[in-house]
A protein has these predicted regions:
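Alpha-helical transmembrane bundles and membrane-interface segments of multipass inner-membrane proteins
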Residues: 1-146
């Protein structure tokens, strides 16, 4: 139920952005945060945009999800399992978005003065949470090994 809920929430926010903003339109929320409608044809942060077919990106993402799912099954650590779960949720949601649109909708834009972080979405946040948790589990594991 959590998996479906998080994917639904990500896809819903992407739909609402597409339905209410024009492409590249930005709405200032506060000094550091804007909502913006960006079509990401590449991978994270728009890398490889226009250089690789969306079908290739989908195939690569599916292979990565399968590998991470294997790690999820093999792991006996709760923190690792939760971390893999978040990465899988984020990846699946972006895969679904790419299947629907041929691109991924990004809409969260963080900035400070003249520095702008590339736009991202909730699925990217799920993936980032999972990666941070994996790093934490690595440090916890290495600390207990000593």
């Amino acid at each position: 139920a959590i998996l479906v809920s998080l994917i639904f929430f990500d896809l819903l926010t992407k739909y609402l952005i597409q339905d209410n903003l024009f492409l590249n339109q930005s709405i200032k929320i506060n000094e550091y945060f804007d909502l913006v409608y960006v079509q990401n044809f590449g991978v994270s942060f728009g890398l490889f945009s226009g250089y690789v077919s969306h079908w290739i990106l989908i195939l690569i993402a599916l292979i990565v999800v399968i590998l991470i799912f294997y790690l999820f099954i093999k792991s006996d650590k709760q923190l690792e399992k939760l971390a893999y779960f978040f990465v899988i949720i984020g990846a699946l949601s972006n895969i679904i978005d790419r299947l629907i649109n041929s691109y991924v909708v990004d809409f969260i834009l963080l900035h400070y003065e003249n520095f702008y972080w590339p736009a991202f979405n909730l699925a990217d946040i799920y993936i980032t949470i999972g990666i941070i948790m994996l790093i934490m589990s690595f440090f916890i594991k290495s600390k207990t090994v000593k």
